[in-house]
């Protein structure tokens, strides 16, 4: 019994070894757990996260700003020819019209040599102007535009209307010689007037309406349009107005087949998949800021994005336009 007691109280070496083994296993597990915990990554301090975010934002803004500036610069030195096709009921032979508007003293090449060369290569039958070749507030020196007119008049007959910037020079700066200078440079200026041209044995009537839609009843435009409406002795009638909203507000009540306008600079900013952003007449997301439209009288209205811009509102994602209209 004494031996049994001693055996129970003091286990044999095998039992001691078993107990130690169990104890050692637990210690090993405990050691692994402690070691794993010591290798865990420490959390990034909040100030570093804020700094990294700011650096990324600055980099993105720099890239965006650079792309924006590049786009603005491109739109000041490049333009595209936009081609339009319309059908006339009476023309016996097709004709081509080149429409320029809103140049705002801009030059493409020395003395606009690039623009003149492109117009010449298009071989137009008529060259029509939509106004705003000058810029009000930048003096009365527009000799470069007069030189352009002289060069264009050597290619084809040139006629057109004045824009709001010419009107402001004429009335506010008292530049009463403006119309005379345009005329001397080869432009037939239409101020609520008609001009007629014979192209390939077809008579083409050009109507030029002056001012803005608000002026229609006050300064002779309404009287002029009423006076020419009964005429039928022409093969094609084109109506010019600087402001495009003139057409849906007033002019679509009269007979013509093609309307041409500018003024909007294509909405200044053109948003992808949305279109023009803003015009003075229509506000945000305008309806008439560039492209082709069908009016209530079934005439086609073409609103050119124009060839220039004012220094206060540069174009963004909005390439200037030289309009080419083929009529058959």
Give short role names for the model-derived ranges:
Residues 1-91:
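N-terminal membrane-anchoring alpha-helices
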Residues 85-98, 187, 194-207, 232-238, ...:
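Beta-strand-turn-beta hairpins that frame and shape the catalytic cleft
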Residues 100-101, 126-132, 157-164, 190-193, ...:
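Active-site neighborhood of phospho(di)ester-bond hydrolases with catalytic His/Asp-centered motifs
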Residues 173-187, 199-241, 247-249, 312-315:
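Binuclear metal-dependent hydrolase catalytic cores centered on His/Asp/Glu-rich metal-binding motifs
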Residues 74-109, 221-241:
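Mobile, glycine- and charge-enriched loop segments
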Residues 104-105, 133-136, 164-168, 195-197, ...:
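Solvent-exposed loop/turn segments at secondary-structure junctions
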Residues 94-188:
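Membrane-embedded segments
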